[in-house]
């Protein structure tokens, strides 16, 4: 999922800075909030499908990484929609007329958050978050079998997040199967198809996708 744990890892551990960490933490929280509360978004409704405590666990994870929380703001937080920009204009007019507090301003989000974790700090707290979610699903009582928990593109990260009793099984689909299903089944059924339907373009796309997979070496990955 975009803006999930792995994107947060990349943003906080590669080229991190104050504004980057603020955006990263809030983008992560917004995505976790959508996954938790949006009942009619098919990958969402975690409140019912995973745990009513999921969003609280995500907030606790962010708090464990945050070293500064401030009422200040970056220009990134001022990139408002047209409607919010209009309200900001009204606030400035009201401020000059002493009707609203001085310097009142609308922001995309608040407060400003700063996190500059070490690799060890990030992985430790991310692992606690992941296992807290898995325990909400019953891991304390029985083993779990989860479909597509990790895609092959992220399997090289596995050792940083999971214990030695965790195994990943890679299902290597035949590209011909993917192309035929998309072109002759899903597309005629008016379903969104995220792959080219021209065979030459599809082959180029699929080859590039396969070649982009970072090599992994882990005895707990079965492929």
Regions found by a protein language model. Name each.
Residues 1-122:
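PAPS-dependent sulfotransferase catalytic core
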Residues 67-223:
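PAPS-dependent sulfotransferase catalytic domain
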């Amino acid at each position: 999922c975009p803006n999930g744990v792995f994107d947060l890892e990349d943003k906080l551990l590669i080229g991190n800075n104050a504004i980057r960490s603020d955006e990263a933490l809030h983008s992560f929280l917004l995505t976790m909030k959508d996954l938790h509360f949006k009942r009619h978004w098919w990958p969402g409704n975690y409140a019912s499908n995973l745990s009513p405590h999921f969003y609280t666990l995500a907030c606790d994870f962010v708090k464990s990484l945050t070293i500064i929380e401030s009422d200040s703001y970056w220009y990134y937080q001022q990139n408002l929609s047209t409607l919010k920009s209009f309200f900001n204009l009204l606030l400035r007019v009201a401020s000059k007329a002493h009707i609203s507090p001085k310097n009142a301003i609308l922001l995309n989000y608040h407060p400003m958050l700063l996190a500059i974790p070490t690799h060890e700090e990030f992985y430790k707290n991310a692992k606690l978050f992941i296992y807290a979610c898995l325990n909400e699903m019953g891991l304390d009582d029985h083993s779990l079998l989860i479909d597509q928990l990790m895609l092959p593109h992220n399997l090289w990260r596995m050792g940083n997040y999971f214990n030695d009793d965790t195994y990943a099984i890679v299902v290597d689909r035949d590209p011909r199967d993917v192309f035929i299903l998309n072109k002759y089944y899903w597309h005629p059924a008016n379903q969104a198809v995220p792959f080219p339907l021209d065979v030459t373009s599809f082959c180029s796309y699929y080859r590039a996708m396969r070649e982009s997979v970072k090599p992994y070496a882990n005895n707990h990955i079965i492929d």
